[in-house]
Amino acid sequence: PANFVLGFGKIDGRRVVVGGEDFTLKGGSPTEAGLRKSVYAEDLAVKYRLPLVRLHEGAGGSVGKSKHASLPSAVFNAPRFRSVAQAMATAPVASAALGAVAGLPAARLVSSHFSVMSNSTAQIMIAGPAVVERAMGEKLTKDELGGAGVHTKNGTVDNAAVDEPEAMEQIRAFLCYLPSNVYELAPVSLCNDPVDRREERLLEIIPKERRRAYDMRRIIKSVMDEGPVFEMGRGYGKSQIMCLARMNGQPVGVWGNDPKVLAGAMTADGANKARRFMELCEVFHLPIICFVDEPGFMIGSQSEREATIRHGANAALTSALLNVPWASVMVRKSFGVAQVAHYGPDAYVLAWP
């Protein structure tokens, strides 16, 4: 049997395609039948224009001998990643790491619009501890090599969850802001938040002392519709905040600088995080609201080693090519080349306070 489970389901009443490796068969290591089925999952998402949810727990390719000899499949075989790319260009793709994930399943995991890993059960690795020890001389546990403490900080995954049920809930929350496919608009919810609601705390949230930091997340929470705000990638590129929220019931992408981290300066990681978020909003037609408190690119020797100027320029170029509506609010400052990324083409710009 194929060691990949595939089917249809519903999330908040919307149909989705869902699939994942069966770890009880060869540890989820891709077999010919399992690989064909995983490609078929992506084909179904494209054909029926449905969101794709992947639940991963599988090893990389097996080096063991099979009783039934067959010609090996080339790692660059087009269907493997053409189907992944086509799915991501057509419908939302959300992935969860629920156990140890390595090799090809790990590559599919990160090839998604949103990824989450279970803090208690999941690890993501190119190769496992035994291979790493033999090849590199590093003796590490699976968690030390590829646990949530590693991959939420380097941007391999967007978020961590306490356990598998919370990982599923995060996928549900992510999908509720997005359309079923790129040919539709995001679902607008009934808004019970009065348009004349006043947030008096905003009057004093910005310190008069310009060297003092403040809580940008409080500003975002106060301005958006009352209710949940879904943050992505909080542990990575920490000076930049990326959220999905609603404004008058309309799903929007929200980007803000975090003055509590490097005064909000854009790092290489922050630039990559912003670029990826802008691409998500562009693909699924989400307007962007940007709260700008940008001192510029982070400076110093580490910043130069990380090629911050290159990654930052790429973020600015991505911003310049977007077509979605864009509104920017200058909260305190907006300096340097880095500020360019915060204002999309023909942005509606406000200065506050």
Q: What does each of the following model-derived ranges do?
A:
Residues 1-353:
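Ligand-binding clefts of soluble mixed alpha/beta catalytic domains
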